[in-house]
Amino acid sequence: MKILTLNTHSLQESYYPEKLEWFVQFVLREQPDIIALQEVNQTVGARRIRADRLVGMVPVPGAETPVREDNHAFAVANALRRSGLEYHWVWIGFKIGYDKYDEGMAILSRQPIAEVESHLLSSCDDYRNWRTRRVLGFRPVYSTDWFYTVHMGWWQDAEEPFRAQWERIEAVVREKKKHGAVWLLGDFNGPAEVRGESYDCVKAAGWCDTYLLAADRDDGITVEGAIDGWRDKVADQNVSGMRIDQIWCSEKAAIRSSRVVLNGKRDPVVSDHYGILIETGEQ
């Protein structure tokens, strides 16, 4: 099984149409079984898409934000379908981003989706508050595993600290871990290199970093330098890179490889984050 995660930055990216096409071509080549995306945007007030055009989309219970014409997840799923690669997909919007976008998260799956859910992680639930955060998860058919796309707050945020959001995730998945593996995919907003903060909090809770489990891995760096959200938090503005995008599993899964993708080496850069692609199974 191949699993991909990427903080897309989507519509906020310069040269967005070109980067959308590059991303689609990457997915067509690699064909991940599961794709977890963060910062999946659409323009506030753009035309709403008719339900019959949302091919493959599974609605999220309780979701109120409609899918609009320039929705990034819709664009990706639609382009893949036109190229002959079908994905089932889920999107939820939960806050205003950059003062002009419905910002949300998405998951795409090659397998049909049996269950989907979204839970509030932040203490605030205000659509106009950029600190509002949710987790979006699904279970594929014929599987007891759950997969969640996450975009966490910062460890030292006085209003919405990482630890409180992490405790809410733990409560969400507690029962599910008894029946199958749970996978957390996304932007954890905490460098793996920093001790005593976000990364160590997750690890101390018994979760397994698939990067460390991988038989074959690279440097894991998913952010070069200081990007949006980190410029006021990194003392050294010339920092070379951080491993803040991670894939965690509740069990010690067999991971064949973990590699950074869409980083300008083998693949073009499409976001201010690079992606992570893991492949499960024995080497």
Model-derived features: where do they sit?
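Acidic beta-strand-to-loop metal/phosphate-binding motif
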Residues: 35-39
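Active-site regions of metal-assisted phosphoester/phosphodiester hydrolases
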Residues: 1-30, 34, 87-283
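Metal-dependent catalytic neighborhoods of phosphoester/phosphodiester hydrolases
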Residues: 16, 40-81, 98-102, 192-203
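Cysteine-dense, low-complexity repeat segments
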Residues: 79, 83-89
